[in-house]
Amino acid sequence: MSSNATDLTTGYLSSAAAILLFGSNFVPLKKYDTGDGMFLQWVLCAAIWLVALVVNLILHCPKFWPFAMLGGCIWATGNIAVVPIIKTIGLGLGILIWGSFNTLTGWASSRFGWFGMDAEEVSKPMLNYVGAGLSVVSALTFLFIKSEIPNNPGSSDTTPLMTEPVINRTEDRSADSSWVDRLSTTYHRIVGCSLAVISGILYGSTFVPIIYIKDHSRRNDSMYAGASQYDLDYVFAHSSGIFLTSTVYFVAYCVAMKNRPKLYPEAVLPGLLSGVLWAIATCCWFIANHSLSAVISFPIITAGPGLIAALWGILIFKEIQGLRNYLLMMLAFCIILAGALCTAFSKV
């Protein structure tokens, strides 16, 4: 098998693994109350950093580039909204929307060389444009799908580790609920979709610093001259940025809550598992980026998890119901599949 064929095989297999894991990594959290998500964010990011540390040791500790941490900071900022998104519009629809905008941002920045990156060329540019255009259509389609989310998805026996002393349980129950739980049904969809769009754009920018370093490593006059071309060498710096940023946000949250944050013990192990799944998926994505290039891997890996998450939402959690929604979902699936295939074949 030729080197090019090996790269393509490795890239597409890594993409498939990343799609499956990204589409399922929030599933362990669905049955547990996670409050406003700030504590969960920190637990999840701690697990991500630990997995990245293991990978870094396996790779014999490649050079640490601090600028690569910026991508992790961007990702952690977008990830703050995950719990509110899932609580307002559901797991399936949330991942579908943020995945679509993730796709467009990542594809456009790689294809056109935004933020100082080198523009990436493909052998069939028209097919690549069609694939990206179909991602836009799928994103618009998802906005018309209505999800059904219960007001209190957490179990009734879930209680925070740290809350105000309870004198009147009836009055304090509403006080203990997060701002998301207190939103009226009217605002659920507006808030959820808006946050999903913002998160998607931030997610789509997360690899920009790494690609920037790789592109400038080929220039002798650059401070990044000689930097590694292997994407996985940057996973530890990327994850360190994630953990550092989430820690800063969590400390700020504790200060804002006057040192009485809402910590949910039942969410700790599911949060760690979710972080491990996400970290493994990200490592697969880094491998796919190296084997296929970001302009190919981004549209495939960012569009695919929505299909997996939607299946979880339809078959297991019953978030999406009704013939109209099922038909729209099937249409969106077909559009995503067509877009992913166009993108994949644009490099062949």
UniProtKB/Swiss-Prot annotation:
It holds the Pfam family TMEM144. It comes from Mus musculus. The keyword Ribonucleoprotein does not apply. It is found in: Membrane. The lineage of its organism: Eukaryota, Metazoa, Chordata, Craniata, Vertebrata. Its main location: membrane. Belongs to the TMEM144 family. Keywords: Membrane, Transmembrane, Transmembrane helix. It is a multi-pass membrane protein. InterPro entries: Sugar_transport (IPR010651), TMEM144 (IPR012435). The keyword ATP-binding does not apply. This is Transmembrane protein 144. The chain crosses the membrane at residues 8-28, 39-59, 64-86, 93-115, 125-145, 193-213, 235-255, 267-287, 296-316, 326-346. One of its GO terms (molecular function) is carbohydrate transmembrane transporter activity.
